[in-house]
């Protein structure tokens, strides 16, 4: 490949590298948004063991929906 075409052939990444949510290192494309397989598996483990939870307000659990039958 000629030298002048190498600069034109440079590919821009689709996403900017973001910090890993587990350790803060720059993320890698193979493990996005994590930096490594280890950080990805740590996050998955937290989801599977229930360490992450979406909070629910008390009044939301007793809300009445007109379309539902009791």
UniProtKB/Swiss-Prot annotation:
Co-factor(s): Zn(2+)
Cofactor binding remark: Binds 1 zinc ion.
UniProt entry tagged with the keyword Cytoplasm: no
Keywords: Metal-binding, Zinc
Gene Ontology biological process terms in this record: regulation of DNA-templated transcription
GO molecular function, one term: zinc ion binding
Spans traversing the lipid bilayer: none
Disulphide linkage map: none
Signal peptide positions (record): none
Residues noted as binding Zn(2+) in the record, renumbered to the chain: 20, 23, 35, 39
InterPro entries xref list: DNA_gyrase_inhibitor_YacG, Znf_NHR/GATA
Domain of life of the organism encoding this protein: Bacteria
Record Pfam families: YacG
HAMAP family noted in UniProt: DNA_gyrase_inhibitor_YacG
Role: Inhibits all the catalytic activities of DNA gyrase by preventing its interaction with DNA. Acts by binding directly to the C-terminal domain of GyrB, which probably disrupts DNA binding by the gyrase.
PANTHER family: DNA GYRASE INHIBITOR YACG
Assembly information from the UniProt record: Interacts with GyrB.
Family indicated by similarity: Belongs to the DNA gyrase inhibitor YacG family.
Protein name per Swiss-Prot or TrEMBL: DNA gyrase inhibitor YacG
Organism of provenance: Rhizobium leguminosarum bv. trifolii (strain WSM2304)
């Amino acid at each position: 490949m000629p030298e002048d075409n190498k600069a034109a052939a440079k590919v821009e990444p689709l996403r900017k590298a973001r910090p890993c949510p587990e350790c803060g290192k720059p993320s890698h494309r193979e493990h996005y948004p994590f930096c490594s397989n280890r950080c990805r598996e740590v996050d998955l483990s937290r989801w599977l063991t229930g360490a992450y939870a979406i909070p629910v307000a008390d009044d939301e659990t007793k809300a009445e929906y007109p379309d539902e039958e009791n």
